[in-house]
Structure formats: structure tokens, C-alpha cells
């Protein structure tokens, strides 16, 4: 496998996982306030 492909897949996975986590954190902060 190409290193570039692995990096792209890794970045896409991080973005996919980080997106919902950020939304949840913001929602919890608003809920706490």
C-alpha cells in the first residue's frame, strides 16, 4: 500500500471521529451552562 493512501485514510478517519466528538463536547458545554 502507498504511504500517501494510508495517510489519507488516517486523516479521514480522524476527521470522521473528531467531528462528532467536537459536536458532543460543544453540546455538553451548552447544556452545563
Swiss-Prot record:
Entries under InterPro entries matching the protein: PSII_Ycf12_core-subunit
Keywords noted in UniProt: Chloroplast, Membrane, Photosynthesis, Photosystem II, Plastid, Thylakoid, Transmembrane, Transmembrane helix
One GO cellular component, as annotated: photosystem II
Keyword Ribonucleoprotein among record annotations: no
Lineage, broadest ranks: Eukaryota, Discoba, Euglenozoa, Euglenida, Spirocuta
Family: Belongs to the Psb30/Ycf12 family.
Organism from which the protein derives: Euglena deses
Record localization: Plastid, Chloroplast thylakoid membrane
One Pfam entry name: PSII_Ycf12
Membrane topology: Single-pass membrane protein
Subunit-level organization: PSII is composed of 1 copy each of membrane proteins PsbA, PsbB, PsbC, PsbD, PsbE, PsbF, PsbH, PsbI, PsbJ, PsbK, PsbL, PsbM, PsbT, PsbY, PsbZ, Psb30/Ycf12, peripheral proteins of the oxygen-evolving complex and a large number of cofactors. It forms dimeric complexes.
Name recorded for this polypeptide: Photosystem II reaction center protein Psb30
Amino acid at each position: 500500500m502507498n504511504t500517501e493512501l494510508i495517510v489519507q485514510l488516517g486523516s479521514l478517519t480522524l476527521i470522521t471521529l473528531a467531528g462528532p466528538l467536537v459536536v458532543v463536547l460543544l453540546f455538553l458545554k451548552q447544556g452545563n451552562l
